[in-house]
Amino acid sequence: MKKQDLSVKNVVAMGIGSAIYVILTRFTSIPTPIPNTNIELVFPFLALFAAIYGAKVGFAVGFIGHTLSDFIMYGQTWWSWVLATGVLGLIIGLASKKLDLKNGIFGIKQILLFNIVQIFANIIAWIVVAPIGDIIIYSEPANKVFVQGISATLSNGITILVVGTLLLKAYAGTKIKKGSLRKED
């Protein structure tokens, strides 16, 4: 099996993506009535990076970006949710091979696939990883963390469905479709 190293492009994407993650978290979070749970417009951006660059970059941008934003904004990091954010980017990134964004293709089939995957990823991240991590690491009450997880799943799923789909459609629109260029006679 061939060892795959990270390319310079992917490392740069991780750094830029993490920095943008921090900025978006700082200035675009919308509070909800559920304690410590916000509507986060950063997650469609994470989905975009994961879909373009793949699972490693998706995980790293989510994990590093969330770590930095927690530390900068709160002075401490909530590791269970940081890991959940990384898992969200990882799962969306794993499915990116099925999307043909680099060839400018993001039609109904790809939109459906992307949204099925992102909903699944949100469920795993926010209803499994984050609450179980909260219970194990921080001894948080189960009823509280699962309500937070369900709220995060719904809000993040909807923001990625709407804004993430629009971002991916716009990105695919900037790419030249395979076979669209023809040699003139």
Swiss-Prot record:
GO cellular component, one term: plasma membrane
InterPro entries reported in the protein's UniProt record: ECF_substrate-spec-like, UPF0397
Keyword Magnesium: no
Subcellular location: Cell membrane
Membrane topology term: Multi-pass membrane protein
Keywords from the named record: Cell membrane, Membrane, Transmembrane, Transmembrane helix
Protein's UniProt keywords contain Membrane: yes
Membrane-crossing residue ranges in chain numbering: 11-31, 45-65, 72-92, 111-131, 145-165
PANTHER family, per database record: UPF0397 PROTEIN BC_2624-RELATED (PTHR37815), UPF0397 PROTEIN SPR0429 (PTHR37815:SF3)
Protein family: Belongs to the UPF0397 family.
Record protein name field: UPF0397 protein lhv_0999
Source organism per UniProt: Lactobacillus helveticus (strain DPC 4571)
